[in-house]
Amino acid sequence: MSLLRSLRFFPVACTGRSARAVLLQPSQPWLTFHAGPSLSSAASSKELLMKLRRKTGYSFVNCKKALETCGGDLKQAEDWLHKQAQKEGWSKAAKLHGRKTKEGLIGLLQEGNTAVLVEVNCETDFVSRNLKFQQLVQQVALGTMAHCQNLTDRLSTYSKGFLNSSELSELAAGPDREGSLKDQLALAIGKLGENMILKRAAWVKVPSGFYVGSYVHGVTQSPSLQNLVLGKYGALVICETPEQIANLEEVGRRLGQHVVGMAPLSVGSLDDEPGGETETRMLPQPYLLDPSITLGQYVQPQGVTVVDFVRFECGEDEQVAEAE
């Protein structure tokens, strides 16, 4: 702007030519200014940078470096960023290994006759509330669901299974991600900078005549996580239902709520004598929502038979978890 201003007020000698003629004939080649292509190129680069930043969530510095490395190719730059983040994640994971991971989330996912519970741990509650961590839990749940659905059906009765940390790590990630769950774990560690563990998963699959009730306590939900329900406690309750029951979903939810609150160790029988507050069998326990009756007394008129359950508590001791 100062250059243009100085050109406007430059004194012109009276040589017989007009000032207009002098100004339109720059005496120095470097005074010629072309605005079109360079500005257009800069705008295009900025647009690519913004697009890559929005798509990947990585810093502007890293996105700019990726575009420069890949010659402005958006897809190659995205792949390059993921590979670099994964390398950094594995490096951070090695450094952070051994740090306590008592926080985290339980994830519940149900699709038709199949339900899964997963637990992913981190170091702080702050990170557990981060969307990137919650997306990792989602990938673990989706990977477990795909694993369960690929198993051979047992048509006559329900099936239930568990996956430990090593088994979970080897599962393929969800349908919109590449690699295994341990690759997704490395990416999350690289982004969030905390030690994390894919602790465990449980899955249940039922045929016709059975139903899976579920409940998660301390619910955290995000529209971007679709049908995934997150919390600090979770339960699946397998019921046999020979007839169609109108309020089956509500009954299943209440049974799951009881399992979370009363922490039974076994189902027990309707004929069992109640053992009071220390009772660990589910059916003889005082019903959580009405302690004046046992859970068995609540269940019997509902027309369902409780046959099994799974309970997860985030951060609980591994020996306790194995016993349950």
Curated annotation (Swiss-Prot):
Positions of modified residues (N6-succinyllysine): 75, 132, 191
Cellular-component GO terms for this entry: mitochondrion; nucleoplasm
InterPro entries: EF-Ts_dimer_sf, Transl_elong_EFTs/EF1B, Transl_elong_EFTs/EF1B_dimer, Transl_elong_Ts_CS, UBA-like_sf
TM segment ranges: none
Modified residues (Phosphoserine): 269
Record keyword Transit peptide present: yes
Residues of the transit peptide: 1-44
Subcellular location, record wording: Mitochondrion
GO BP terms in the entry: regulation of mitochondrial translation
Pfam entry (one): EF-Ts_N
GO molecular function: translation elongation factor activity
SUPFAM superfamilies for the chain: Elongation factor Ts (EF-Ts), dimerisation domain, UBA-like
Primary location: mitochondrion
Gene3D superfamilies found in the cross-reference section: DNA helicase RuvA subunit, C-terminal domain (1.10.8.10), Elongation factor Ts, dimerisation domain (3.30.479.20)
Keywords: Elongation factor, Mitochondrion, Phosphoprotein, Protein biosynthesis, Transit peptide
Function in brief: Associates with the EF-Tu.GDP complex and induces the exchange of GDP to GTP. It remains bound to the aminoacyl-tRNA.EF-Tu.GTP complex up to the GTP hydrolysis stage on the ribosome.
Family indicated by similarity: Belongs to the EF-Ts family.
PANTHER family in the cross-refs: ELONGATION FACTOR TS, ELONGATION FACTOR TS, MITOCHONDRIAL
Protein name from the UniProt record: Elongation factor Ts, mitochondrial
Organism: Mus musculus
